[in-house]
Amino acid sequence: MRVENGIATLHGAPEISVLLRRSGRARRLSLRVSGLDGRVTLTMPQSLHLSTALEFLRERESWLRTAMTRLPAPCPVALGADILLRGEILRITEGCGARIHVQGSQLRVPPDPTGTRTALRVATYLKASARAALVPASEKYAAALGRPFSAITLRDTRSRWGSCTAQGRLMFSWRLIMAPPAVLQYVAAHEVAHLKYMDHSRTFWTCVAQLMPDYQTHRDWLSNNGAALHNYCFTSRPEADNG
């Protein structure tokens, strides 16, 4: 095992990098594998000696390797591959025009002789589609709540689907456009509700229910299926949109 710059590397096939994280709140050692990106984190109490944590990691290496094999394989975005858009599976195929568009059960993309631009083009298309859906959804719920927001930003976040700052700035993951439209609407309602309640109290959830009475169904969909949206692998990702 090699330890460098807060990363422990387990030798073998394949090598596994483990982020070593100290936490003042941790009372015991905890080894976790992210279902979103496969990242491995070993969390330890502040006062625990590093050698104890590394021994814990060695003892659980077999479990860790088994857990890694159970992670879903990434889905490269390329010609001939499938992708989700608004909850529907579309096949990425080559079109003859200069713009991406949906045609039946296909996502038609411009010709890409080198095979190097399709993923970025699709990601950019998804991001634009997400903005076109999230802006009016947020405006609708903000108007219903009587609380305006100051800006909307789209990012490719892995730890959360959206956020709301005290300054009224809303942030959303553009991958929400892959989910069914009602799921995207739920996240918009959720974040807009934070314009009034900056917590997850019972009052907050009552507010969400007022904006979207059947929100729980869509929240459950995201809990059960959201990780799959992160399996799609784009060779290049669009920059954050601060518009």
Stretch-by-stretch model annotation:
Residues M1-Y186, L195-G243:
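Active-site-proximal or metal-binding-adjacent scaffold patches in catalytic folds
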Residues E191:
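Walker B catalytic acidic pair
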